[in-house]
């Protein structure tokens, strides 16, 4: 049997669109791609939204999403959708990790640290709100939130909208037995960057 090599080439950021304005791929000199599309069989597939396991078709794809989906052969929930499903069916609260968190925080303070936005790439604020609500249901008395502002997967000036949403939610839960507040904050560019300068990282961690 004759066999031929197959090469899987991943080109992040390359997409198919007839739009001219802002279309770097269409404007570029791409002789190899042009040849392949003119002489070989090909098809366009979606790399965003529900086709790759994200919550909705409004959610853009990115390198992490694409790399997780390549070669699966079927749609798997990933990222924010996976977390959202586990919250909706309650399985996250049955996990050993959650049970241990709640047990350790009884009589103490439970801290939440994470990205505060609904960008759905790395987080969704609805998950945090749900966990704060569940923490109260399970008898915890004190919650402190350390917010990392986004500005990348959502508009750069949208941070206060998420702060208000969080504060309104906590205010609706706070009473004589429950106290939830924002304790500190920071920016994702300082605390979530892959290879930050040591001075930047140390200063940001101390702040939070």
Report residues per predicted region.
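Secreted, luminal/periplasmic, and some membrane-associated catalytic domains
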Residues: 192-195
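Conserved anion/nucleotide-ligand pocket segment
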Residues: 197-200, 205
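Active-site nucleophile/metal-coordination loop of metallo-enzymes that catalyze phosphate/sulfate
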Residues: 2-6, 14-190, 203
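Conserved small/polar residues in nucleotide/adenosyl-binding loops
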Residues: 208
């Amino acid at each position: 049997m004759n066999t031929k090599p197959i090469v899987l080439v991943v080109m992040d950021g390359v997409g198919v669109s007839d739009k001219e304005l802002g279309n770097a791929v269409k404007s570029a000199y791409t002789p190899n791609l042009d040849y392949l599309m003119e002489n070989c069989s090909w098809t366009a597939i979606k790399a965003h939204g529900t086709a790759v396991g994200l919550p909705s078709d409004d959610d853009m794809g990115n390198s992490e999403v694409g790399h997780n989906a390549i070669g699966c052969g079927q749609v798997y929930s990933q990222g924010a959708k996976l977390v959202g499903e586990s919250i909706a069916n309650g399985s996250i609260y049955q996990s050993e990790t959650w049970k241990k968190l709640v047990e350790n925080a009884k009589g103490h303070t439970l801290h939440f640290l994470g990205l505060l936005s609904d960008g759905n790439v790395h987080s969704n604020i609805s998950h945090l709100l749900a966990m704060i609500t569940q923490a109260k249901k399970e008898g915890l008395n004190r919650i402190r939130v350390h917010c990392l502002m986004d500005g990348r997967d959502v508009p750069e000036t949208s941070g206060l909208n998420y702060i208000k949403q969080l504060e309104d939610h906590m205010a609706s839960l706070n009473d004589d037995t429950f106290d939830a507040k924002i304790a500190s904050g920071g920016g994702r560019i300082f605390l979530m960057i892959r290879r930050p300068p040591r001075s930047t990282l140390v200063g940001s961690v101390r702040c939070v």
